[in-house]
Design a protein with these regions (language model features):
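A short alpha->loop->secondary-structure connector
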Residues: 131
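Non-cytosolic coordination micro-motifs
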Residues: 154, 179-181
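A recognition module on extended beta-rich or small alphabeta surfaces enriched in W/G with H and D/E
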Residues: 127, 135-170
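Low-complexity, glycine/alanine/valine/leucine- and proline-rich hydrophobic stretches
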Residues: 121-128
């Protein structure tokens, strides 16, 4: 499997100004100012210890991300120059441990790896992590939704769609879009 997540992240970084900010076009023509932050990489030892603690082999694309950045914030919303959060918060290994203790409805087969603006968590299915290329789920409050994606495809599409909930797009036809918005 060719892993391209580093290329996607480098492309995004090239679009950012010196403050890590940029303007993006949101749905229905909304112009938003956003900020991105990328944290220092995790070491091979930290990743291996994490895998041993959870008794899991992490997917290759997610391991590559961790070796590049042990966490990131993508498309945090800026209002009048102040970061008000939102966007995609890719958790560090430490934040994953903490989240596993605090997410009330988290099933033991899942590892939370990111948090989204609308209260959703992006999850790796431990039972599929080393055997199935489509191992990603979304936990939305109390409902689990299989995304039929891996980590790097999710991040790539999230960046290309400029932070939109792209996984819901196939649900909208012109007819039902205007009824719900």
């Amino acid at each position: 499997m060719a892993v391209f997540i580093e290329k996607t992240l480098e492309g995004l970084k090239e679009l950012l100004d010196e403050r890590g900010q940029m303007k993006i076009l949101g749905k229905e023509g909304t112009l938003n100012e956003v900020e991105c932050q990328f944290f220092a990489s995790a070491t091979d030892q930290e990743i291996t210890e994490f895998e041993k603690k959870l008794n899991v082999t992490l997917p290759e694309d997610y391991r590559v991300f961790l070796k590049t950045h042990n966490g990131a914030r993508i498309y945090d919303v800026m209002i009048y120059g102040s970061n008000v959060g939102g966007g995609l918060h890719i958790l560090s290994l430490k934040e994953i441990y903490e989240s596993m203790q605090t997410i009330a409805l988290l099933k033991p087969t899942f590892i939370p790896v990111a948090h989204l603006l609308d209260g959703c968590y992006l999850l790796i299915d431990k039972t599929k992590a080393s055997t199935d290329p489509n191992y990603l789920w979304l936990l939305n409050q109390t409902e689990y939704e299989f995304l039929n994606l891996n980590f790097e495809l999710f991040v790539d599409r999230y960046i290309v769609s400029q932070g939109a909930n792209f996984w819901k797009w196939n649900l909208y036809s012109a007819e039902n879009y205007y009824r719900t918005n």
